[in-house]
A protein has these predicted regions:
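Rossmann-like NAD(P)(H) cofactor-binding subdomain of soluble oxidoreductases
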Residues: 77-129
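Short beta->alpha hinge that forms the Motif I/post-I loop of the SAM-binding pocket
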Residues: 34, 67, 92
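Residues at the starts of beta-strands that form the adenosine-phosphate
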Residues: 4, 28, 113, 140, ...
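N-terminal Rossmann-like NAD(P) cofactor-binding module of classical short-chain dehydrogenase/reductase
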Residues: 63-64, 90
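NAD(P)+-binding Rossmann beta1-loop-alpha1 motif at the extreme N-terminus of oxidoreductases
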Residues: 1-54, 58
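Internal alpha-helical scaffold of NAD(P)-dependent oxidoreductase catalytic cores
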Residues: 133-218
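Interdomain hinge/lid region at the active-site interface
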Residues: 203-254
Length: 254
């Protein structure tokens, strides 16, 4: 189906994707990373078969990219013209309208198929050292069709990602995705981060158990990444923050 797969960005998500693909498919896995040392580490440790070069781009059937939002856009705009016609591209960025707005027409112009993607999995750590070949087991994989994709491409992607261990695939529009993710993911990080800003947080030892652990698990943010994600989805996130403030105010008044 996808004989050669390029994973761009070998951090937690990209590294886990590379490990999963290599372990569970017959695809040849190429890796690209902004820092050469990380790509060399991935080659030495086994998640990839080779480090991607411009010459190898023409051999790639599927690109999966796990960079920050603007870095993903910049990388794809630079490298789409190097890819063979008909290549399929899936990003793993946690916002979708921003991505589609910047990449849909460029994909059409380059003759490649761009599909927005978002694997609903992660850890409270970052980097290749924390990547796992089981990270996506049972998780949901969201696909956002674009004008450059087709039913055939989407069906192929759904089958391929299910073979990687995902529990289900979901299709939606970019707008639907961003509104739901503002609630299910981004708001949770905001609330968790705000919660531990209480002066009582430093005194929790001996007074905390499961509830505290659950609510604070995602409080430690990758500030650079999450700031960019929040700003790219500012309006839906602001609406969700307003909504929870309204409900908290109801509790306060009672």
């Amino acid at each position: 189906m996808f004989d050669t797969v390029l994973v761009a960005g070998l951090g937690l998500m990209g590294g886990s994707m590379a490990k999963t693909i290599k372990a569970r498919t017959l695809s040849r896995v190429l890796g690209w990373n902004r820092t050469r040392a990380t790509a060399e580490q991935a080659l030495a440790d086994g998640p990839i078969h080779a480090i991607a070069t411009d010459a190898l781009f023409r051999e790639v059937d599927l690109v999966i990219i796990g960079l920050y939002p603007q870095a993903t856009v910049d990388w794809l705009l630079e490298n789409m013209p190097k890819m063979k016609k008909g290549c399929v591209i899936v990003d793993m960025v946690g916002v979708k309208q921003f991505m589609v707005d910047h990449l849909e027409q460029a994909a059409l112009d380059a003759g490649v198929h761009y599909v927005g993607g978002h694997p609903m999995a992660g850890r409270e750590f970052s980097g290749l050292d924390y990547a796992l070949p089981t990270l996506f087991d049972g998780a949901s994989m969201i696909f956002v069709p674009t004008k450059s994709s087709s039913e055939r491409i989407l069906s192929q992607l759904e089958a391929y990602f299910m073979s990687l261990g995902f529990g289900q695939t979901v299709r939606c529009t970019a707008e639907q995705h961003d509104h739901m993710i503002a609630f299910t993911s981004q708001l949770a990080h905001v609330v968790s981060s705000a919660y531990i800003k209480s002066p009582e947080a430093d005194k929790h030892n001996g007074y905390s158990a499961g509830s505290y652990k659950d609510l604070t698990r995602v409080a430690k943010l990758n500030e650079t990444m999450w700031s960019e994600l929040f700003l790219c989805n500012a309006e839906p996130l602001a609406c969700e923050i307003d909504e929870i403030i309204r409900h908290l105010d109801e509790y306060r008044r009672v």
